[in-house]
Amino acid sequence: MTNEVLPGVRPANRQEIVLFHSAYGLRPGVLEWAERLRHIGHRVHTPDLYDGEVFSDRMAAVRKIQELGFDELLARSQAAVSHLRSELVYAGFSNGGACAELVAATRPGARGAILMHAPLPIRDLGWKTWPSTVPVQVHFAEKDPLRNEKVIDALAVRVRASGAGFQQHDYPTSGHLFADPDMPAYDATSADLMFERVVEFLKS
């Protein structure tokens, strides 16, 4: 399944979500998150930007990104949602968060952006302002080796300046992809808390 809503659950504030995978591809951990969101009534799409390729090794994942190039990755992200309705929440893990950030900022109708271990500088994505109708939620491990406070702060300033809501949640762990059960950085407590906070954001 890639976008079904499971029967019997119909919350009044059900959202339609696009969940982008990380540099490691559409791993089981991403699909598990999608299923959990479906179980509480949301409709979730999980585009595969790698055409089936999945990685467990960091260097192999980095090589894949280098092979594609960031512009191509973002182009694939935009193409993946082109056939969908406009009123969507965009979410993603790591590189997938950057994809979610781009699409949420540039595709009219976005209802929110959930960036897990992810934000990029707005100027690097080619625009100066953030849409006033698109709230943002950012999640990071406190000791994530890829965390850049200046980038997070700059995004917060731009989003708040637009009038949109901005939430930042930090977690007492040191890994990057701490929500993927099959990755060395997995932290079950932090992953569950992040999921709970995402669910609350989707209610707003």
Language-model region placement:
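C-terminal catalytic histidine-bearing segment of alpha/beta-hydrolase fold enzymes
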Residues: 165-204
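Acidic catalytic loop of the alpha/beta-hydrolase fold
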Residues: 143-148
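Active-site signature of alpha/beta-hydrolase-fold catalytic machinery across serine-
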Residues: 32, 102-106
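Short beta-strand/loop motif that positions the catalytic acidic residue
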Residues: 132, 138-140
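A conserved short beta-strand
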Residues: 109-119
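Short beta-strand immediately N-terminal to the catalytic nucleophile in serine-hydrolase-like folds
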Residues: 90-92, 116
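Gly/Ala-rich beta-loop-alpha elbow adjacent to hydrolase catalytic centers
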Residues: 92-96, 100
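Serine-hydrolase catalytic machinery in alpha/beta-hydrolase-like enzymes
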Residues: 1-85, 178-179
